[in-house]
């Protein structure tokens, strides 16, 4: 609820969407989590952690190509461990 309140009050605050997505992953609501990661990325195109986590979530739900695309973007933005994960799924 707190994240929803923050998102309502500050709709451009990327970290609120990112944190809500992380919480949804813990609750195993992966499709909703992807939606919130996507909103975080739309608010901040350079949000490497959001690309990374969305990529992992895509891979978890077996959307490997989308996951690899996001992990690649996360790597470009400085999360170099993403490249190691990509090599496992190609």
Model-inferred region functions:
Residues 1-90:
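Alpha-helical tetratricopeptide repeat
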């Amino acid at each position: 609820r707190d994240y929803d309140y923050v998102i309502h009050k500050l709709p451009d605050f990327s970290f609120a969407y990112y944190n809500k997505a992380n919480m949804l992953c813990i609750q195993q609501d992966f499709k909703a989590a992807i939606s919130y990661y996507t909103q975080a990325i739309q608010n901040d195109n350079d949000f490497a952690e959001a690309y990374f986590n969305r990529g992992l979530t895509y891979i978890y739900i077996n959307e490997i190509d989308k996951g690899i695309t996001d992990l690649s973007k996360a790597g470009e933005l400085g999360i170099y461990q993403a490249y190691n994960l990509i090599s496992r799924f190609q």
